[in-house]
Amino acid sequence: MANEYLYGAYGHIGETVAQSAVQAGTTPVYIGTAPVNLVRDFGKAGIINAPIKITSLVDAQKKIGYSSDWGTFTLCEAVYAHFNNTLGNIGPIYVINVLDPSAGKHRKEMATTKALTFTGGRAEFASDKIILDTLTIAKNDSGNYVEGTDYAVDYNFTKGTVIITSLKDDAQLAGSLTASFSEVDDSEIADSDIIGGVTSSGEYSGLSAIALLYPEQFAVCNLIAAPGWSHSPAVYNAMLTTCKKINGHWDAFVVADLPLVDSTAQAVDTITKAIAWKKANAFTGERSKVYWPQAVDNLDNVFHLSTLAVVELMRADFSHNSVPMETCGNKAIPVIKQYFGANAKNRGFDQQSGKELTQNGISTAVAWGGEWVLWGDHTAAYTYGADVDPRAIFDVSMRMLMHITNDFQREWSPEIDEPMTRALKDRIINREQEKLDGYVSMGALLGSPVILFLESENSTTDVMNGDFRWDIAVTPTPPLKSASVYVAYTDAGFSVYYEGGDE
């Protein structure tokens, strides 16, 4: 409603409305760095080492900041891929930022000075490393101008610029003035920050902060990614550890990358090198997919394929009512070529050569069917011809098993501590059987899976202690990994020349 008397027709330009994103049931958590230095009062916002829900690009700018420097601020790549995607946006996502611009943390010791020229009471300069809370503007004589009284500070995320505007019409900031501010120092961030931990005083950080997601927001993490960091063996192994029984209950699937440069600064820029690196560094977890190389879009943005894979896994899940029955393989991605590093000579490879990667448990991206697509539906544990647990052959198999166990726990956790009557036992069986039949009907499972309450698995001692168990054996539907048709030549068709008699 108007807060002043109006008479006539008026028009007002309001706040930006973010491009809508499809709301998926899949819950990915990204761990990395965000430009929270661009968020005012970041120290009180609870945006460091905590899961933050992001629903749009504008939402990200408000909560964690945004920068086009994805190398420094790795979480911005995920934000862009989910909420500025030419193929369609999808979310929400959760991010855990480990960058802490506080004094003594990830902040440069020496302050930065910047000469400003004010025109019409306004000045603007580019910086995404500035800690906005530390900005001061010196007077030409002595002392500093006062923010909120003499001037206001804003940030343009589209241009990456700081905007300073005078607040007093009769005493505007003018001419040449000097600004002083602190900047973030991302060189201080290490694998250990991403891995994180839990202190004796109950402080969570890095991957360990995923454990805060359910008790604080009642969301169940089922995908974990750390683009820009997951190529580190230490981080990858920590991701595999974290993804098992989060909060003692939830299972998640890891999506990671292989590096373009190894720990000795040697390029990993060929298929042969990538396969060798994967084996040497044991990137073989059955609860994970690994990708190599990276990819570039038409604006020269360089994406980790793990990020694009999470986007397409969410999109595929959404198309099946959040049931992870379809791989992200052969799904279009908004890129124009593969990327092997700034100085790499590799021009890329096709789908046929890409088979060398996929048969060694490395997913990739190729040009196929007139577009660029993700390629590969195996877990990292797969190697063609090797002895692999059948459940670990395809990513959909592992994710379906996780989906069933996670869903069982979410469905029946409200019944814990209720009387375990015969009626409740039967209700659990009937409901779970109904879901299994539904999975078969939609094509997520094959055969006739049955949930069983076995006497052999529910001893008198177990029942006496209130411990009950149900057993389910399922066959997740495999993807159509290959389709072959065999065509043979025959001379039988020549008989048409002799049909119908003489002419």
Spans of features found by a protein language model:
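Surface-exposed interaction regions enriched in Ser/Thr/Asp/Glu
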Residues: K139-D193
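Extended beta-strand solenoid/passenger and fiber regions
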Residues: N89-F157, V184-D185
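Short, surface-exposed secondary-structure junctions/capping segments
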Residues: G71-E77, I164-T165, E499-E503
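Compositionally biased, low-complexity/repeat regions
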Residues: S180-T199, L445-E503
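A glycine- and small-residue-enriched flexible loop/hinge signal that marks low-structured segments
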Residues: M1-R107, D141-G143, Y155, S192-P414, ...
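A general secondary-structure signal for short beta-strands and their flanking turns/coil
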Residues: I47, A174, N465-R469
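Extended, compositionally biased non-globular segments
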Residues: L401-E457
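Generic recognition of long tandem-repeat/solenoid scaffolds
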Residues: T117-S127, T158-D169, A367, W372-G385, ...
